[in-house]
């Protein structure tokens, strides 16, 4: 599964930004990919291990990430549970204010699996977070710090999660100013 088409469709239809706040899209800066990670001391070493743990006792596998039920990070967890052949409605998911809080909870052992994004996890890893990536949710391995992390697809889980990252401005900004920003960012 690939989330990028949904992100791009929303951009094309002008649906982006905080709900209820008029904003104007300026430019896409790049893509961020989903990441599945566990505590570095976890016995889980692969997606196969994670799927086996889910099948063995789903209630013991506590997922967590920034966002609420229905958010992108929650959907990643639900799709992993579905890949294990179980109903996502039985999973335990802890919502955090953001990825940083979720990664702190993972490091503290309060959740078992982080279903966030590579960019936020990279920052945490660089700061010494106690996490081990199991999979990146991209078509191909990512460069740099993630180059040795296999994709979910390499491990038999058909899950790709790309999020478009970009800039937008307030809805009250003039058309001329938006055009100047778009030209500068092109």
Predicted features along the sequence, with ranges:
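Conserved hydrophobic/amphipathic secondary-structure segments
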Residues: 1-165
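Short amphipathic alpha-helical coupling segments at ligand-binding clamshell hinges
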Residues: 46-49, 174-185
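Small-residue transmembrane helix packing/gating motifs
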Residues: 159-171, 176-180
């Amino acid at each position: 599964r690939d989330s990028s088409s949904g992100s791009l469709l929303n951009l094309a239809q002008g649906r982006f930004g905080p709900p209820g706040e008029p904003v104007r899209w300026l430019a896409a800066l790049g893509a961020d990919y989903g990441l599945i990670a566990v505590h570095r001391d976890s016995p889980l070493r692969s997606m196969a291990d994670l799927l086996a743990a889910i099948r063995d006792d789903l209630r013991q596998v506590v997922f967590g990430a920034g966002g609420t039920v229905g958010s992108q990070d929650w959907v990643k967890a639900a799709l992993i549970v579905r890949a294990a052949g179980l109903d996502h409605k039985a999973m335990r998911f802890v919502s955090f204010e953001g990825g940083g809080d979720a990664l702190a909870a993972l490091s503290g052992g309060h959740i078992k699996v982080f279903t966030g994004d590579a960019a936020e996890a990279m920052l945490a890893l660089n700061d010494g977070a106690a996490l081990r990536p199991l999979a990146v949710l991209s078509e191909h391995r990512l460069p740099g710090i993630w180059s040795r992390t296999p994709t979910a697809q390499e491990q038999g889980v058909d899950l790709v999660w790309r999020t478009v990252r970009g800039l937008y401005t307030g809805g009250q900004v003039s058309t001329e100013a938006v055009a100047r920003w778009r030209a500068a960012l092109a």
